[in-house]
Amino acid sequence: MRKVLLIEDDALLCWLLEKILKNKYDVTVKNDGEEAWSWLINENIPDLIVSDLKMPSLSGIELLENLSANDTLKSIPIIIHSGYEDAGKRKQCLDLGAFAYLVKPFEPEYLVSEVERAIESRNENILAK
């Protein structure tokens, strides 16, 4: 089963996103970016990260910056989600290597399709190497 790291500081939304994903994926939940980063640098390598943009302690953008600077972790696709449609933030996230930028609210099916697309893309990149 593919492993997904879900990073979300809103408890209700976190519960909902985990419920959507756990039928198809092994989901690990972290409630802020700092907690997630500590988990990642201890050699926990998920197939995908789904992260909120705006979080206490370490934002989604800071997480993207950390990932892109780490040779072991930079190949992990990350989907950023935000409650704000901000073209500048979207561009910044995509420029930093985010696979997708989703604006809340989004349909559960859309999230699942983006997760599947991101994991397939990672698998193709691994096979190409």
Question: What positions do the PLM features span?
Answer:
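Conserved acidic carboxylate
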Residues: 8
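The feature encodes the CheY-like receiver
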Residues: 14, 56, 65, 86, ...
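C-terminal output helix
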Residues: 106-115
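Acidic, metal-coordinating helix/loop segments flanking the phosphotransfer/catalytic sites
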Residues: 29-48
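Acidic catalytic/metal-coordinating carboxylates
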Residues: 32-35, 59-65
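Two-component/phosphorelay signaling modules centered on CheY-like receiver
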Residues: 11-29, 35
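Alpha4 helix (beta4-alpha4-beta5 surface) of REC/receiver domains from two-component response regulators
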Residues: 62, 85-100, 113
